[in-house]
């Protein structure tokens, strides 16, 4: 067995753009023969995947699944909505979700490692960067999920509620984007930041500080209601709040998770001509 030196790994990295561990693995399998390693990497799609790794993957799908008293939600990204609808991409996302559920995996790095070879092969086949972005789970007495197309997914956990109510609550979360369950759950740093913003606005209107502070106190109560699930008007019956709805059913929400495809990812905008030019350079 030939010695796989750091300089050999470095050279392969420079020539292929692949990751260090991928290069070391390829060299080991090729017994230190760098040309054979490159040939094998080309066949496996590793080089193509490495070249695509820098491309922003901000499209994709959200998948949800309930397994007993635990529900899982997963986001897998690609670069375009066209690929997001591809059967192979969808099957890959389903397989990753099934593995997360079966193994109770909530560490995305574990999933990434488990499916790296399949991801690389799919990148080579489809021609876009693919990323297993995030996974989460939620436990509860009664669980519900809702998916708005493939782009928004919601899990809701409740007690004292039936499945229909939990489904409606999940639909509400999808539409209204609450950040917390109850107004009292709003974190101190969020409250303080909003308080300062509102105080500055009130002071700029020329109000004395004492009056401005009283105005802001009223606004803050409204703010914590707006960002919390129970404080929001129920989307299916806006005359009542979600909190009032839950009280009528003697139910309580213990948690929720909302994923939306690409949220927080800065997508690079390119015009059609630039996109065609970029594609011609790659071919």
From Swiss-Prot:
Source organism, top-level taxon: Bacteria
UniProt xrefs under InterPro entries: EF-Ts_dimer_sf, Transl_elong_EFTs/EF1B, Transl_elong_EFTs/EF1B_dimer, Transl_elong_Ts_CS, UBA-like_sf
Subcellular location: Cytoplasm
Disulfide bonds: none
Keyword Cytoplasm attributed: yes
Chief location of this protein within or outside the cell: cytoplasm
GO molecular function, one term: translation elongation factor activity
Keyword tags: Cytoplasm, Elongation factor, Protein biosynthesis
Region of interest called Involved in Mg(2+) ion dislocation from EF-Tu, as start-end residue ranges on this chain: 80-83
Any Pfam family hit: EF_TS
Tagged with keyword Plastid: no
An example Gene Ontology CC term for this record: cytoplasm
Family, per entry: Belongs to the EF-Ts family.
Physiological role: Associates with the EF-Tu.GDP complex and induces the exchange of GDP to GTP. It remains bound to the aminoacyl-tRNA.EF-Tu.GTP complex up to the GTP hydrolysis stage on the ribosome.
Record protein name field: Elongation factor Ts
Organism: Salmonella paratyphi A (strain AKU_12601)
Classification of source organism: Bacteria, Pseudomonadati, Pseudomonadota, Gammaproteobacteria, Enterobacterales
